[in-house]
């Protein structure tokens, strides 16, 4: 485990480590802790009640953050013909087929998201060893292999976040930046938990959303009372 910095030790002194904070209070704390000279990311870790070693309990999906993420993503689309025109019109940064594949093979990977129409997977499939380790391989489960490339591009540009449970049963994600106000961060966190609830495996037993903690890039984590987040979801439904 990495040693705490002097600043992080000071932050820990302000937190009751056994306390579950209401979401508004937790966000206020991490915004207070985010004092770096850059606009720190606000991150979340969600412990799920799943056994990630079982294939039927792997939680994976995507959610469009209603308030964006504060990051502009470059989007590459593998498609052709009319679909290529639709992708460009929707805001895609790079569109191509074999020519784009050649760029990827040459190491020119200057994009954050890859989308592909189904007919393009014959080309994209050859790039698995390059795109896969970088988390860029298109997948229908997260909406990046689709005939509706225009919507996929718009979603990516609007702040869509992909999530996948790790071996420890934890989902990691970013819900915005320190410069976001509390309501925007809370709205994004609620959207993520809503998406996780919808992705709950049928075989998951017991408490599903077990623990939630938020932190800034350079700050320590603050545990959040799950009910204070999901209460907002209930009010919206």
UniProtKB/Swiss-Prot annotation:
Which GO terms are recorded in the biological process aspect for this UniProt protein?
regulation of translation; translation
The terms under GO molecular function for this entry are: rRNA binding; structural constituent of ribosome; tRNA binding
| Entry keywords, A to Z | Repressor, Ribonucleoprotein, Ribosomal protein, RNA-binding, rRNA-binding, Translation regulation, tRNA-binding
Q: Which InterPro entries match?
A: Ribosom_uL1_bac-type, Ribosomal_uL1, Ribosomal_uL1-like, Ribosomal_uL1/biogenesis, Ribosomal_uL1_3-a/b-sand, Ribosomal_uL1_CS
Q: Which CDD domains match?
A: Ribosomal_L1 (cd00403)
Q: Which region is the signal sequence?
A: none
Q: One GO term of the cellular component aspect? A: cytosolic large ribosomal subunit
Pfam families per the UniProt record, alphabetical: Ribosomal_L1
Disulphide bridges, residue numbers: none
Source superkingdom: Bacteria
What PANTHER family does UniProt report for this protein, alphabetically? 54S RIBOSOMAL PROTEIN L1, MITOCHONDRIAL (PTHR36427), LARGE RIBOSOMAL SUBUNIT PROTEIN UL1M (PTHR36427:SF3)
NCBIfam families membership: rplA_bact (TIGR01169)
Regarding protein family, the annotation reads: Belongs to the universal ribosomal protein uL1 family.
Subunit note: Part of the 50S ribosomal subunit.
Q: What does this protein do?
A: Binds directly to 23S rRNA. The L1 stalk is quite mobile in the ribosome, and is involved in E site tRNA release.
**What is the official name of this protein in its record?**
Large ribosomal subunit protein uL1
Task: Give the organism the record lists.
Answer: Leptothrix cholodnii (strain ATCC 51168 / LMG 8142 / SP-6) (Leptothrix discophora (strain SP-6))
What gene name does this entry carry?
Answer: rplA
């Amino acid at each position: 485990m990495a040693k705490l910095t002097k600043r992080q030790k000071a932050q820990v002194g302000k937190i009751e480590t056994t306390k579950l904070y209401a979401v508004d209070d937790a966000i206020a704390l991490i915004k207070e802790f985010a004092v770096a000279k850059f606009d720190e990311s606000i991150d979340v870790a969600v412990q799920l009640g799943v056994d990630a070693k079982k294939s039927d309990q792997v939680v994976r999906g995507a959610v469009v953050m209603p308030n964006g993420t504060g990051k502009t993503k470059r989007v590459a689309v593998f498609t052709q013909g009319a679909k290529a025109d639709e992708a460009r019109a929707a805001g895609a940064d790079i569109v191509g087929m074999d020519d784009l594949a050649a760029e990827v093979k040459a190491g020119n990977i200057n994009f954050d998201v890859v989308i592909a129409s189904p007919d393009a997977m014959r080309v994209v499939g050859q790039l698995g060893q390059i795109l896969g380790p970088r988390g860029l391989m298109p997948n229908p489960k997260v909406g990046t292999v689709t005939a509706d490339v225009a919507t996929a591009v718009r979603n990516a540009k609007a702040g869509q976040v992909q999530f996948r449970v790790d071996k420890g049963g934890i989902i990691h994600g970013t819900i915005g930046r320190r410069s976001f106000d509390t309501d925007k961060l809370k709205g994004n966190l609620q959207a993520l938990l809503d998406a996780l609830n919808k992705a709950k495996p049928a075989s998951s037993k017991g408490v599903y959303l077990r623990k939630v903690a938020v932190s800034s890039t350079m700050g320590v984590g603050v545990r959040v009372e799950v009910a204070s987040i999901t209460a907002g979801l209930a009010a919206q439904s």
